[in-house]
């Protein structure tokens, strides 16, 4: 049986190198999402011998004005990057002030993914689900791209819209602890469900 973790933060683990060694000798596959383009370049080197670790080219919405939001570097790497994430929007209290910049960057990332195709994209959508869906509806054309909502926290009508767009959903233990999380899980078609740990957070 192959186990697949669709969203974890390998680069944020205290024992990253030890964990990489364990994973590459196991039957487990994982999508190691990144937070910045610079982190991606470093993590690719650490995981170059681990065929079952798929490193994501990320631009986390919480970091878009931190000095690490190097879109030029992102653009130079995306063509050869099959896995994209963590990307998306975060309109929670601590990050709402960068809302317009987040929208511009995420829109650009989706357009780039549509240009190159064959991408697997892990999306952060905290308190911003409707805008994420609007952007996907505007630019999503390639059937070969797989858009995954990580830890979906939107409403049921928003979930239905995301399903209509062909999106996937990675669920984690944190979602099992809330009534709304359980309702979301029950409503997702089984062939659109993926599992994630969100390690080291969930």
Predicted feature residues:
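Mid-domain alpha/beta scaffold segments of enzyme catalytic cores
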Residues: 1-202
């Amino acid at each position: 049986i192959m186990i697949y973790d669709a969203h974890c933060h390998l680069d944020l683990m205290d024992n990253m190198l030890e964990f990489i060694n364990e994973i590459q000798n196991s039957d487990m596959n994982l999508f190691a999402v990144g937070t910045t383009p610079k982190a991606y370049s470093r993590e690719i080197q650490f995981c170059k011998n681990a065929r079952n670790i798929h490193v994501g080219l990320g631009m986390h919405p919480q970091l878009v004005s931190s000095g690490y939001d190097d879109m030029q570097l992102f653009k130079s790497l995306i063509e050869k990057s099959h896995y994209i994430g963590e990307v998306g929007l975060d309109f929670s209290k601590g990050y709402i002030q960068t809302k317009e910049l987040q929208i511009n960057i995420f829109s650009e990332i989706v357009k780039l993914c549509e240009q190159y195709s064959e991408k697997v994209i892990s999306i952060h959508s905290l308190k911003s689900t409707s805008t994420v869906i609007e952007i996907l509806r505007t630019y999503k054309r390639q059937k070969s791209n797989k858009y995954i909502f990580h830890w979906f926290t939107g409403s049921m009508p928003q979930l239905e819209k995301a399903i209509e767009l062909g999106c996937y959903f990675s669920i984690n233990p944190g979602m099992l602890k809330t009534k709304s999380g359980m309702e979301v899980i029950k409503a997702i078609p089984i062939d659109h469900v993926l599992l994630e740990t969100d390690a080291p957070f969930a």
